[in-house]
C-alpha cells in the first residue's frame, strides 16, 4: 500500500487512496503505532465520490472512527490538490457533513460549517465547562493559566462526557492559547483544529474576542480562525513529509 505522511500544525497523519477493502480500523492501529508502525495521530482514507471531489474515512490512532478532524481535513485537502491533482477549491464529504477547502501552496483554509450545538455552562471537578460540537464534541474550560491543564482530570472528563477536553487562555481579544486532550488518541496532542475552533467560537459567543483571531496550540504553530456568515473558518500551514510503501500484516 502506498501512503503519504503529512503534518498540520502539530498533528500528523498517514493518508492513502483507497484501493482495496481492507480492515481499515486494524490498519489504522498498525500504521499509527509510533513504535512498530509509521506513527501518526490519525489515518485518512481518500475515496471517490460521485457528487463531491472526494469522500474520506478518518480513523484515530486507536482504530476508532471519527466524524471529523480539523487539521486532518486540511492535510486531506493538501493531499487531494498536490497528489491527486484536484482543483485548489474543493468540497468533500466527511462523517460530520460537507467540508469546503481552499489550498494556496502550503496554506490550507477549511470551513467547518455551522456549529452543530452548544450547551450551557456547568460545574464539574472544580471547574466551569461548556460543551461545543464543531463536528466532534469538545469540552472547553477558560483558565487563567494553561498550567492548570491536568491530564488525569482530562481523562475523567473525556470518559464521563465522551468528548475531547480543551483548556483555553485568552491573551487578548485577538489571540488565544489552547491545550487539548484528544479522544481516540487518549492523551494531550500538539494541536486540534476542531478543539481550537470550539474554544474560539465559545469565546466569540461570550463576547471575549473579535470574529477573527490567532490561536497558538501546544505545537507553537499559530493558526488563523474567523467566524463569518455563521460559518467557522480556519487556516494554517500543511507539510508534506514523505511517501513510501507499507506491507501490512
Curated annotation (Swiss-Prot):
Residues marked Could be important to modulate the pK values of the two catalytic cysteine residues (site): 138, 182
Primary subcellular site in the record, as a coarse category: cytoplasm
Locations listed in the record: Cytoplasm
Pathway named in the protein's UniProt entry: Amino-acid biosynthesis; L-lysine biosynthesis via DAP pathway; DL-2,6-diaminopimelate from LL-2,6-diaminopimelate: step 1/1
Classification via Pfam families: DAP_epimerase
GO terms, molecular function: diaminopimelate epimerase activity
Record text on subunit structure and interactions: Homodimer.
Function of the protein: Catalyzes the stereoinversion of LL-2,6-diaminopimelate (L,L-DAP) to meso-diaminopimelate (meso-DAP), a precursor of L-lysine and an essential component of the bacterial peptidoglycan.
Protein name listed in UniProt: Diaminopimelate epimerase
